[in-house]
Amino acid sequence: MRILGIETSCDETGIAIYDDEKGLLAHKLYSQIKLHADYGGVVPELASRDHVKKTIPLIKEALKEANLTAKDIDGVAYTAGPGLVGALLVGATIGRSLAYAWGVPAVPVHHMEGHLLAPMLEDNPPPFPFVAVLVSGGHSMMVEVKGIGEYKILGESIDDAAGEAFDKTAKLMGLDYPGGPLLSKLAEKGTPGRFKFPRPMTNVPGLDMSFSGLKTFTANTIAANGDDEQTRADIAYAFEEAVCATLAIKCKRALEQTGMKRIVIAGGVSANRRLRAELEKLAHKVGGDVYYPRTEFCTDNGAMIAYAGMQRLKNNEVSDLAVEARPRWPIDQLTPVMK
């Protein structure tokens, strides 16, 4: 079975073709970073228009890369949510229309389930069950995962997601867009221990998180200490340290609560090297393992959607002619895939 995956939930157009026997046959990605850079963030209308321009050409490129034609595709998977509604509608409309024209089934895919399953694309995929640390620009949550579709949210951010906090703090520090990766790069030059940032909500029970207050703490630290280059690097170091330590503390609680020892990190922030190191250290302490996708599959991509869609199609989950786009869609509302 070969599945075409379409991802257009935000500011990346991702197209991929996945074969259940041969694996990933094609993977195309177009980032809109330059388009939104002047605005300091994603402009939804511009994102939607750009998806309209890029999706079909990228599908043609993917088919060519895989040496396939439309007749070789057995199903189309598209991101139906959560995300920007206009951007979602572009991918959903194109995906549903192509499936109808080609006479194959279409399946709407949950964006965060795609991220959660991205490590399954690797040579050493994680076995179930595990605790998933889903961290991106729009979501931060701890999820108990017993199987595909068997998700229980253990805790989530009550305000800014981790990736959002990175980007907003970077903007506060005068870094270019997208600021998260630039802040991490600046943090590499920082002096450990010069500043100590709080670990939000770690002194209270539970697994919910909060990252918005770290922006204010950053602003106050800059105001009190100036913003010369080394001070900026030291502040970036302390900020990143606080976010990663907070996630590690919450993950440790999740492991204790569930009795699990396997950790999966997924989402855009899963590319952060310090976060990986913190969770690898945690896994080592509990005698467990940590899994994460290769860097190119940490950000939004079509490969994860194609893979997740294949699992859903094998479960006979086929959409009707309606075009689905759900800007809000809790991951624990998904149905389990029958084993």
Swiss-Prot record:
Cofactor: Fe(2+)
InterPro entries referenced in this protein's UniProt entry, alphabetically: ATPase_NBD (IPR043129), Gcp-like_dom (IPR000905), KAE1/TsaD (IPR017861), Peptidase_M22_CS (IPR017860), TsaD (IPR022450)
Assigned keywords, A-Z: Acyltransferase, Cytoplasm, Iron, Metal-binding, Transferase, tRNA processing
Pfam families registered for this protein in UniProt: TsaD
Domain of life: Bacteria
NCBIfam families: gcp_kae1, T6A_TsaD_YgjD
Protein name: tRNA N6-adenosine threonylcarbamoyltransferase
Species this chain originates from: Vibrio vulnificus (strain YJ016)
